[in-house]
């Protein structure tokens, strides 16, 4: 059995699970002021929309069982919907994942189950790194899904991780990334200055022949 996952923010890591261990697509919409707030120690819940497709009929009701399990590892207001198509079953999840510093996320995860987070860090050049990271709950979810069906599971990174960075800051913001695609064009290094209300859509390819199959996608943000 083969399956695909598509996650949109605007969505997840996502973010989440199905017959394939890695999601196909994770779309994340990130506002620059949310990053600024997170740097001050607050947690910001980032909305995620994830869709998973299995290329077979779900005769045993595994998707419904997986949904019940996944609810334990997602925000309480997550919305699940399932539909059937010509190629199999599709499960859509609308949820959120937390954005924050390592310290604030550690505290948050002490009382909240989430399979993925957006980690904010400041490097030695004063650039702000934002990366998608799985948590210990991701491994727990993967294990429980495997108990239902050995073809079920969850892991990161996704085949494609799509960061949509939107500037709502008063001043210009610089966003950059390494080895990415923008408007379907490959870039060894991508950089863009965002005016207020400007945006950049950056895609990380995480397929098996890509470096991002082994490391977590990260974008760099600089507030001049």
Regions found by a protein language model. Give the residues of each.
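N-terminal, post-signal-peptide region of Sec/Tat-exported proteins
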Residues: 50-75
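Bacterial signal peptide processing site
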Residues: 22-24
